[in-house]
């Protein structure tokens, strides 16, 4: 019997107290947990440095407990105090103004303090009725709404506790705790509205700390926000989340820090009768304590900032669960976001145990509530989340396989195989129910969520046919589950899934690809999925069709959550390197660098979370810290920088950078379970190209040299390898008579030559209603007046002199 304690239900944010004597103690170990979340102190000193313990999972399945060595905190007479806040267990949680008390409505805790004395004897102090309880000065402790703390409060009496057994299964954590990552100092702003605002210079997740300068009874209110509007404080995008810290001072000089909440923010509005000093305030950045494994940079400052933004969004949203956003009244473990970003996350940090726990969350939801299927988000709040549908529910397939490829842990793959198998079997049964055509599904899916080719500007559903997306992800689920079965020696499963995947592919081809090789759908995401999953008769023909689609879109991306994470990978794999660079490095809306030029320090939820005039979009759903679109960094790491894992656990990698002169240098170092991989490349001033590769002990690499005049590639073993040559392509002089006019317009030097040499054609190209910018210089024989075509004569030769910096 595990004996927990609780007190009168009217006591909000209670403190549980145990006093005891201890002499000549050799070692003291505290095992402890609490629901919702707890903070423990022994003799006035904090126990451990974890935040938001015990963390978030489905508490009906298990409750995690933490273990701390508290020997150094012991005195002769001791007082252990444990304060509880609502957390995920009791607090407001869910979409919009979500309900409270998903798992319970009573605070409770369990603890066991094991004392080993110098004479070898032992004593165990457990939660029982010898403990006392009292009210705390924490008046509100909500994950969404923040914390209200009154340090003038003194509990009038101590209350008895009730010992009971709630029947919870206690379990040691498998994932790392939430810790402080770093700390940020703000600058002080006075807005046009007269508001006092702290700017931390970086959007992040965490809590606020300040040095208390207030006299007794004085209040300070700190409210958080992500962006300014018109230079003034703004927080409407948080929806119903108050996200604030209200503090009433006891007049004691000390550090004051929130303990039972977290916020996603960059700016803090300060309401206080007294003047403040920015140096008294600190932004405490919180994230699951994952080892950073990636070091990389390029010669392109905005691309470097994009990679850093993706990292900050991962830090902000990896708080025990991979959430979608850290700021508004949501903060849920959305499965679609998680699967899209998983590969990128595993590059950035050691995510194995973090994802192990999330796969446990998925498995609990799958078996308890969804009969083999998977939810939109996990934990699912006791099955109240809807079915995830294609792409989202496929987190149960993509994440286990991604984790296996990065870490090569066959035991973990075996542990997660039932998750993969049962979800795949649900898809197969759905297929059978619909006649086993392998194509048409009639269930909900978010599709290409937030794509820009929907029915209207505010549409959340993209233009790619949902049945096609469902069919493609059905194919992927069967294929990857078959691969997992093959790895695990489950031959019967493997053979069945391999045959079925071939049948599904054939059915999808019959439905969506003509005999002549044309795709029946004409969206960017449709081409991405077809090329990614081998749905073509002729790959080059399908790639050419995608190129034409991009051209009709003026090389602006239109993809959403399904297509965008894969877009650049597909383009680069299909040899559409110019197109990939053009989209990635575009500074115009929509695009990744557009966000940065509009002040982004994390990845946005929507391409237009901020409009071009700086206003927050009127879509009613705008998070400025959403990592899903940060998955583009995977293409940067694996294709542009050129370091790609091709066998489980990084035993073999492919080094095949896709190079253009817009990026002159690249360097990446990746710590893996097999050692540290390094690759760096550079375009010299004379146009020569150099590549260096460092292969860890016991590993091999397949090296493909970009634009080598002899199409050189080779396999190499451990050690250092260096290559230098003059490439067949002139990376530094990209313009000639075949140049794309859009590329010319985006290069200031080339655009100036264009304007001087062909002023009329230049003006037409800059006309937003003209399609000239989507043409190449050698394609002006149609759709352009003859007089303007003549202006282009000799322009290509002049443009050859333009050299990329």
Identify the residue ranges that each predicted region occupies.
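Alpha-helical support elements that line or immediately flank enzyme active sites
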Residues: 28-32, 207-224, 271, 337-365, ...
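Alpha-helix capping and helix-loop boundary segments enriched in small/acidic/polar residues
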Residues: 5-11, 29, 55-59, 69-71, ...
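Active-site acid/base region of carbohydrate-active enzymes
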Residues: 37, 134, 280-309, 315, ...
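Heptad-repeat amphipathic alpha-helical coiled-coil interaction surface used
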Residues: 404, 475, 479-482, 494, ...
